[in-house]
From Swiss-Prot:
GO terms for cellular component: ribonucleoprotein complex; ribosome. It comes from Clostridium novyi (strain NT). HAMAP family: Ribosomal_bL28. Belongs to the bacterial ribosomal protein bL28 family. This is Large ribosomal subunit protein bL28. SUPFAM superfamilies: L28p-like.
Length: 63
């Protein structure tokens, strides 16, 4: 599954995680992406959307 929102473009962010002893390890933070059926140009289509776009109403779900 894609790790990028098709509505807002939110994607994976990389960075460094620090342990308690301050040792570093590289890691990735992935957005909460859901695969939903949404109406795109009047046609129901399966799209990958982040949960923030779903909650804010930027996506019209197909029933």
């Amino acid at each position: 599954m894609a790790k990028r929102c098709e509505v807002c473009g939110k994607g994976v962010v990389s960075g460094v995680q620090y342990s308690h002893s301050h040792r570093q390890s590289k890691r990735r933070w992935a957005p909460n992406i859901k695969s939903v059926r949404a109406v795109v140009n009047g046609v129901p289509k399966k799209v990958s959307v982040c949960t923030r776009c779903l909650r804010s109403g930027k996506v019209q779900r197909a029933i």
